[in-house]
């Protein structure tokens, strides 16, 4: 856990100032006349016009200065950038100034501020999240949505908070065995939920930051399946969204994702008509969280599922953690080291049709699979890239 004591990074501060003053790195320059803020070129290494000798020179110089790279070593621009990014973010003497940076131009750059001695920028390794826009008057439906998501949209402090709070248990304390009025005697019965706490990561918790790409993609990938057949896919860039059958006329700023429309006479359409307020989903650096607002019984399977064959049913109006980034990264290290299987990263939600009489067997008519884009990206790394990542951990 990061302590409140300021982290001594005088070498980093002196080195940065010297490099900015030297003018030897294209694009690395002061951003104000008082020389309290500086720019760093931040072009993605995957861009076609990426020039390693120019766009990555500053990051490479830091790796060489720290003795983390010499000619012939594995690794590359993405690894070098990650090292410097983490060093700046952990330091109490630097603070990123996002409003002065430009990431949407041909030559993107970030701006960092040099803080005076004794000024602490905040908890090392954390990022501030813009608060939701406040309005003087909002509809009751919108307020309900935002209140419901408050517990799901957890503070995305990269990995530190997740790792520091592993003792809370993988289930997040949100899964219960009662699904309220939506359950019936013939519907899938929930199992008793037990504590699924796992052993904490043995080693440097901060080192897990190096597993993530310099600009990790926490977008949500959705696959819609009706009666065993894939009928649609979607990618959601926002941190939270709501899965619904029909667009809502409310003033809510939360993104709405519509289920694909089936034929009017299909059983799936009958089930979708009961979706009502739908499902809330939060996808952020902490992981994946869902909240069931509809009356339809929904079972789930995910990396954070409690022990037992299931089915595990989502409680009504409660936030449930289904995927935790910190656990995934821990298991990914073991997989790269040949000490375990590939970590699971996909979440499955099964929507059940209510039973109508003792002879009616509940049907799983709708399935939604979801995952975070960065997880698949990491699992698809080449052996050389895996070795480079392990060298940082």
Curated annotation (Swiss-Prot):
Residues 120-151, 163-202 are annotated as: Disordered. It is found in: Cytoplasm; Nucleus. InterPro entries: Interferon_reg_fac_CS, Interferon_reg_fact_DNA-bd_dom, Interferon_reg_factor-3, SMAD-like_dom_sf, SMAD_FHA_dom_sf, WH-like_DNA-bd_sf, WH_DNA-bd_sf. (Microbial infection) Ubiquitinated by Herpes simplex virus 2 E3 ubiquitin ligase ICP22. Induction: By IFN-alpha and IFNB1/IFN-beta. The modification Phosphoserine is found at residue 139. GO terms for biological process: cell surface receptor signaling pathway; defense response to virus; immune system process; positive regulation of transcription by RNA polymerase II; regulation of transcription by RNA polymerase II; transcription by RNA polymerase II. Keywords: Activator, Antiviral defense, Cytoplasm, DNA-binding, Nucleus, Phosphoprotein, Transcription, Transcription regulation, Ubl conjugation. Its main location: cytoplasm. Residues 9-116 bind DNA. Interacts with STAT2 in the cytoplasm. Forms the interferon-stimulated gene factor 3 complex (ISGF3) with the heterodimer STAT1:STAT2; upon stimulation. (Microbial infection) Interacts with measles virus V protein; this interaction prevents the binding of IRF9 to STAT2 and thereby the type I interferon signaling pathway. It is linked to Immunodeficiency 65: An autosomal recessive immunologic disorder characterized by recurrent viral infections from early infancy. Clinical consequences are pneumonia, bronchiectasis, and septic shock. Affected individuals have lymphopenia or hypogammaglobulinemia, particularly during infection, and impaired cellular type I interferon response. Patients may have adverse response to vaccination with live attenuated vaccines. This is Interferon regulatory factor 9. It comes from Homo sapiens.
């Amino acid at each position: 856990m990061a302590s409140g004591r300021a982290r001594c990074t005088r070498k980093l501060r002196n080195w940065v100032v010297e490099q900015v003053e030297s003018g030897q790195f294209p694009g690395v320059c002061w951003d104000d006349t008082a020389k309290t803020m500086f720019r760093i070129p931040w072009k993605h290494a995957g861009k076609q016009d990426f020039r390693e000798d120019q766009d990555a020179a500053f990051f490479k110089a830091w790796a060489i200065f720290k003795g983390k790279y010499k000619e012939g070593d594995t690794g590359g621009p993405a690894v070098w950038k990650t090292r410097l990014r983490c060093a700046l973010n952990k330091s109490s003497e630097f603070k990123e100034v996002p409003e002065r940076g430009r990431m949407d131009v041909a030559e993107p750059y970030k701006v960092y501020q040099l803080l005076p001695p004794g000024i602490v920028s905040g908890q090392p390794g954390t990022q501030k999240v813009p608060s939701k826009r406040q309005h003087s008057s909002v509809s009751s439906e919108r307020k309900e949505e935002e209140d419901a998501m408050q517990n799901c949209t957890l503070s995305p402090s990269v990995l530190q908070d997740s790792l520091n709070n592993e003792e809370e248990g993988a289930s997040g304390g949100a899964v219960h065995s009662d699904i309220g009025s939506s359950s019936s005697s013939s519907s899938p019965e929930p199992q008793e939920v037990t504590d699924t706490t796992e052993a904490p990561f043995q080693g440097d918790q901060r080192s897990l930051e190096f597993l993530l790409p310099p600009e990790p993609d926490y977008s949500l990938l959705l696959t819609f399946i009706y009666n065993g057949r894939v009928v649609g896919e979607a990618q959601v860039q926002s941190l939270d969204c709501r899965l619904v059958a029909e667009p809502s006329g409310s003033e809510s700023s939360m993104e709405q994702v519509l289920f694909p429309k089936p034929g009017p006479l299909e059983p799936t359409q009958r089930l979708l008509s009961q979706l009502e307020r739908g499902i809330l989903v939060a996808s952020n650096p902490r992981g994946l969280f869902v909240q069931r607002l509809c009356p339809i019984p929904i079972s789930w399977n995910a990396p954070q599922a409690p022990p037992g064959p299931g089915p595990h049913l989502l409680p009504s109006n409660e936030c449930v953690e289904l995927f935790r980034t910190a656990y995934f990264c821990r298991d990914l290290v073991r997989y790269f080291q040949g000490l375990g299987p590939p970590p699971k990263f996909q979440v499955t939600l099964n929507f059940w049709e209510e039973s109508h009489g003792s002879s009616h067997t509940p049907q799983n008519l709708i399935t939604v699979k979801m995952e975070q884009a960065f997880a698949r990206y990491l699992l698809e790394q080449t052996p050389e890239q895996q070795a480079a990542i392990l060298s940082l951990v």
